[in-house]
Amino acid sequence: MYYPLLSIALGSVLGAWLRWFLGLKLNPIYPQIPLGTVTVNLVGGFIIGFAMAYFAHSDLSPNYKLFVITGFCGALTTFSTFSIEIVTLLQSGKWGMAMLAISIHLIGSLIFTCLGLAAYYWVAGH
């Protein structure tokens, strides 16, 4: 009964720690479009794409899916952080940079989700 809750909680802790670490290390490199936020959204898109395909063909306990998708990816990806970064750019009058950041996050995440799906099918030989 508690395994789903524990699965989500443990995945969330690990995802949040990784998000914090990548933000700490990568955001100072190019603050106009914080690379930590971009990285976690792209990596999260890849992981969720791969995981969805994997779990669709797996007999593993649903708790593993909760751990990876709901917990880890849910804590790793950063829509709220992305939103405030875009609003800050807009408030600073940096409309072009805001549109570039939106494009990178949205298109990049979709591409990386597709790459994750494709990677699973390539690895699994489907």
Swiss-Prot record:
Example GO molecular function: fluoride channel activity
Subcellular location: Cell inner membrane
A single Gene Ontology CC term: plasma membrane
Keyword Coiled coil set for record: no
Ranges that cross the membrane: 4-24, 33-53, 67-87, 97-117
Catalytic activity: fluoride(in) = fluoride(out)
One GO process term, biological-process aspect: cellular detoxification of fluoride
Pfam families, sorted: CRCB
Activity regulation comment: Na(+) is not transported, but it plays an essential structural role and its presence is essential for fluoride channel function.
Location, primary (coarse class): membrane
Membrane topology: Multi-pass membrane protein
Family affiliation: Belongs to the fluoride channel Fluc/FEX (TC 1.A.43) family.
Name the UniProt record assigns to this protein: Fluoride-specific ion channel FluC
Residues that, per the record, bind Na(+): G74, T77
Keywords: Cell inner membrane, Cell membrane, Ion channel, Ion transport, Membrane, Metal-binding, Sodium, Transmembrane, Transmembrane helix, Transport
UniProt entry tagged with the keyword Cell membrane: yes
Chain's role: Fluoride-specific ion channel. Important for reducing fluoride concentration in the cell, thus reducing its toxicity.
